[in-house]
Swiss-Prot record:
This is Ribosomal RNA small subunit methyltransferase I. It comes from the Bacteria. SUPFAM superfamilies: Tetrapyrrole methylase. Keywords: Cytoplasm, Methyltransferase, rRNA processing, S-adenosyl-L-methionine, Transferase. It holds the Pfam family TP_methylase. It is found in: Cytoplasm. Coiled coil: none annotated. Belongs to the methyltransferase superfamily. RsmI family. PANTHER family: RIBOSOMAL RNA SMALL SUBUNIT METHYLTRANSFERASE I. The gene is rsmI. Its EC number is 2.1.1.198. GO terms for biological process: siroheme biosynthetic process. It comes from Synechocystis sp. (strain ATCC 27184 / PCC 6803 / Kazusa).
C-alpha cells in the first residue's frame, strides 16, 4: 500500500513553503494537483520534477478511484491545492474518505491556511470559531445559513471573491445587524496584504468607496446576549396565527417559526394547541 500525503502550499508568499513539504513533493511518485499549470510553477521554483495528475471538482469522482488504485498498487501520492491546505474549500475530502475506507495511510504535511492566518490576526475570539467557506450564491440556502449565523456565538470565518464582497457584507448586515464587528483580511501573505477592522456598516461604506480587489477572508464576531432577539408570548402567538391563516398546519407553522426564532419546536407547538383551545 502507498501513502497519501496532504501537502499544504503557500497562499501567496513562497517563503511559507516548508522544507518538509518540498521533500515530500520531491520523493512521492505522483502529485495530484487542482491545477497542474499553477502547481507546475511552484514545482519549477523549488526544482521538483515529480510528475503531476489533475484532481479538481470537475473530475474528482472518477479520478478518486484512479488514484485509489495507484495507492493500492504501492505508489505514494501527494495531494495539493492551488494554494493553502488541500480539503479546505478545495478538493480532497472525498479522496481522504476513500483512503480511510480502504485502510490506506493518510499523512498531513501542515502549512499555510488562509482562515487561520486571518483568524489569529483579527483580534476577535480564537478559542471557538466556525468556518463556512464561501456562502452559497443561491438565495434560499444563503438566507437560511445567514439566519442561523445571526445567533452563532462562535467567531465566524468566511471566504469571498472581490466581485461579491459588497453583496455579502450587505446580506450580513441585514441578518447580523450593522454594529457587528469584523475584520476583513485581503491578499494574505502577498505584497498588498491588508487588514481592515470595523463594523458591518462601516465596512460597506469603506468598500463602496474602495473597489474590492484580491482574495478576501471575513472574520466576524460571534453573537452576544444583546444580539439575541427576545420574543414575547403574544408575538409568538401572532406569528403562529399568521402562518396558520396561510394554510400551514400546527406542526408546519411550529417548525417554520422554530427555524426563524431558534426556539424549541415543542414550545411553539404547545402554543399552537393553546391557540386552538382558545378558539
Amino acid at each position: 500500500m502507498g501513502i497519501l500525503y496532504l501537502v499544504a502550499t503557500p497562499i501567496g508568499n513562497l517563503g511559507d513553503m516548508t522544507p518538509r513539504a518540498v521533500e515530500t513533493l520531491q520523493t512521492v511518485d505522483l502529485i495530484a494537483a487542482e491545477d497542474t499549470r499553477h502547481t507546475g510553477k511552484l514545482l519549477q521554483h523549488f526544482q521538483i520534477t515529480t510528475p503531476q495528475i489533475s484532481y479538481h471538482d470537475h473530475n474528482r469522482h472518477g479520478r478518486t478511484q484512479e488514484l485509489l488504485a495507484k495507492l493500492q498498487a504501492g505508489q505514494n501520492i501527494a495531494l495539493v491545492s492551488d494554494a493553502g491546505t488541500p480539503g479546505i474549500s478545495d478538493p480532497g475530502q472525498e479522496l481522504v474518505a476513500a483512503c480511510g475506507e480502504a485502510n490506506i495511510e493518510v499523512i498531513p504535511i501542515p502549512g499555510a491556511t488562509a482562515l487561520i492566518a486571518a483568524l489569529i490576526s483579527s483580534g476577535l475570539a480564537t478559542d471557538r470559531f466556525v468556518f463556512e467557506g464561501f456562502l452559497s450564491t443561491k438565495n434560499r440556502p444563503r438566507q437560511q445559513l445567514l439566519q442561523s449565523l445571526a445567533q452563532e456565538e462562535r467567531t465566524i470565518i468566511l471566504y469571498e471573491a472581490p466581485h461579491r464582497l459588497l453583496a455579502t457584507l450587505t446580506d450580513l448586515q441585514t441578518f447580523l445587524g450593522q454594529e457587528r464587528s469584523l475584520t476583513v483580511a485581503r491578499e494574505l501573505t502577498k505584497y498588498h496584504e491588508q487588514f481592515w477592522r470595523g463594523t458591518l456598516q462601516t465596512a460597506i461604506a469603506y468598500f463602496t468607496e474602495n473597489t474590492p480587489k484580491g482574495e478576501f477572508c471575513l472574520v466576524i464576531a460571534g453573537a452576544t446576549p444583546e444580539d439575541r432577539p427576545s420574543f414575547s408570548e403574544e408575538n409568538l402567538r401572532d406569528e403562529l396565527r399568521s402562518l396558520m391563516a396561510k394554510g400551514l398546519t400546527r406542526s408546519q407553522a411550529s417548525r417554520q417559526l422554530a427555524e426563524e426564532t431558534k426556539l424549541p419546536r415543542r414550545q411553539l407547538y404547545q402554543l399552537s394547541l393553546e391557540l386552538e383551545a382558545d378558539g
